[in-house]
């Protein structure tokens, strides 16, 4: 039997050609945009190469759903990275939010959360994400003020900066965002007054949560223009009239204003028929309880304790589900479940 001996040099050449062909085939079949992959790898580096991002490998396709937290646009088949979830990573030391995020121009959704070692301000590079709809930066140690440049991202629908170390005052400019539907800034160190401009959010704006901060001053009268489904301004240092948040013509479902210094006549406010949660405890609210409370078919929670309310508690409807704790420590409230009026 005749044997053919392939020279060593030819064998090496064939191996090199085979490697090139395999690499070329991989490159041609990869869906991930090269610029997006480069940006993601830089983000990984900027975060100290955490072990939780070990699936982000330069030799694999970032659009094949093996890269943790990365999704690409398969609907339009552009396969640009449009969804990035950077949550729960254990960084080796403190790092700022990577400015390299700006190199993912097709991002629609960005979630950064649960990273204790994430520090520093929200970088101006975020303003370059002009297609961003949903921005979440939560449960980190990111600090500084909420930046004005967010008003440049006209596509924003949701802003959630809850439970960080943010300080400074609320930026008036975000009220100009035409598509913004809600803000969640609770659990920070934000101080100062609520801007008057926050009463001029678009009709799409239905949710405001700025609880557990250091807000002072009064709720702007311009809030009468808003139709909020959910508002939570509890645990601040707000004072004065909050009746502008109420109205029988509104679609309000929850109003949480507990632990402020608000003072207004509760008996004179109109109530949304959709109201299912009302928490007004620990304020200086006076007057009587509205009789309209008995007509609220969806009311599930009520707390008006520790105020200056007087008069007989209305009876009927869903009010029968609430016990003494909902009404305790008022000036002169009476009637079931409190002692009877005399």
From Swiss-Prot:
<feature type="disulfide bond">
    <location>
        <begin position="334"/>
        <end position="341"/>
    </location>
</feature>
<feature type="disulfide bond">
    <location>
        <begin position="32"/>
        <end position="62"/>
    </location>
</feature>
<comment type="function">
    <text>Inhibitor of fungal polygalacturonase. It is an important factor for plant resistance to phytopathogenic fungi. Substrate preference is polygalacturonase (PG) from A.niger &gt;&gt; PG of F.oxysporum, A.solani or B.cinerea. Not active on PG from F.moniliforme.</text>
</comment>
<dbReference type="GO" id="GO:0006952">
    <property type="term" value="P:defense response"/>
</dbReference>
<feature type="repeat" description="LRR 1">
    <location>
        <begin position="82"/>
        <end position="107"/>
    </location>
</feature>
<feature type="repeat" description="LRR 9">
    <location>
        <begin position="276"/>
        <end position="299"/>
    </location>
</feature>
<feature type="repeat" description="LRR 2">
    <location>
        <begin position="108"/>
        <end position="132"/>
    </location>
</feature>
<protein>
    <recommendedName>
        <fullName>Polygalacturonase inhibitor 1</fullName>
    </recommendedName>
</protein>
<dbReference type="InterPro" id="IPR051848">
    <property type="entry name" value="PGIP"/>
</dbReference>
<keyword id="KW-0134">Cell wall</keyword>
<feature type="disulfide bond">
    <location>
        <begin position="310"/>
        <end position="332"/>
    </location>
</feature>
<dbReference type="InterPro" id="IPR001611">
    <property type="entry name" value="Leu-rich_rpt"/>
</dbReference>
<feature type="repeat" description="LRR 7">
    <location>
        <begin position="229"/>
        <end position="252"/>
    </location>
</feature>
<dbReference type="InterPro" id="IPR013210">
    <property type="entry name" value="LRR_N_plant-typ"/>
</dbReference>
<dbReference type="InterPro" id="IPR032675">
    <property type="entry name" value="LRR_dom_sf"/>
</dbReference>
<keyword id="KW-0964">Secreted</keyword>
<feature type="glycosylation site" description="N-linked (GlcNAc...) asparagine">
    <location>
        <position position="141"/>
    </location>
</feature>
<feature type="repeat" description="LRR 3">
    <location>
        <begin position="133"/>
        <end position="156"/>
    </location>
</feature>
<feature type="disulfide bond">
    <location>
        <begin position="63"/>
        <end position="72"/>
    </location>
</feature>
<feature type="repeat" description="LRR 8">
    <location>
        <begin position="253"/>
        <end position="275"/>
    </location>
</feature>
<feature type="glycosylation site" description="N-linked (GlcNAc...) asparagine">
    <location>
        <position position="64"/>
    </location>
</feature>
<feature type="signal peptide">
    <location>
        <begin position="1"/>
        <end position="29"/>
    </location>
</feature>
<feature type="glycosylation site" description="N-linked (GlcNAc...) asparagine">
    <location>
        <position position="303"/>
    </location>
</feature>
<keyword id="KW-0325">Glycoprotein</keyword>
<feature type="repeat" description="LRR 10">
    <location>
        <begin position="300"/>
        <end position="319"/>
    </location>
</feature>
<keyword id="KW-0433">Leucine-rich repeat</keyword>
<feature type="repeat" description="LRR 4">
    <location>
        <begin position="157"/>
        <end position="180"/>
    </location>
</feature>
<comment type="similarity">
    <text>Belongs to the polygalacturonase-inhibiting protein family.</text>
</comment>
<dbReference type="Pfam" id="PF00560">
    <property type="entry name" value="LRR_1"/>
</dbReference>
<keyword id="KW-0732">Signal</keyword>
<feature type="repeat" description="LRR 6">
    <location>
        <begin position="206"/>
        <end position="228"/>
    </location>
</feature>
<dbReference type="GO" id="GO:0016020">
    <property type="term" value="C:membrane"/>
</dbReference>
<feature type="repeat" description="LRR 5">
    <location>
        <begin position="181"/>
        <end position="205"/>
    </location>
</feature>
<dbReference type="GO" id="GO:0005576">
    <property type="term" value="C:extracellular region"/>
</dbReference>
<keyword id="KW-0677">Repeat</keyword>
<keyword id="KW-0472">Membrane</keyword>
<keyword id="KW-0611">Plant defense</keyword>
<dbReference type="Pfam" id="PF08263">
    <property type="entry name" value="LRRNT_2"/>
</dbReference>
<keyword id="KW-1015">Disulfide bond</keyword>
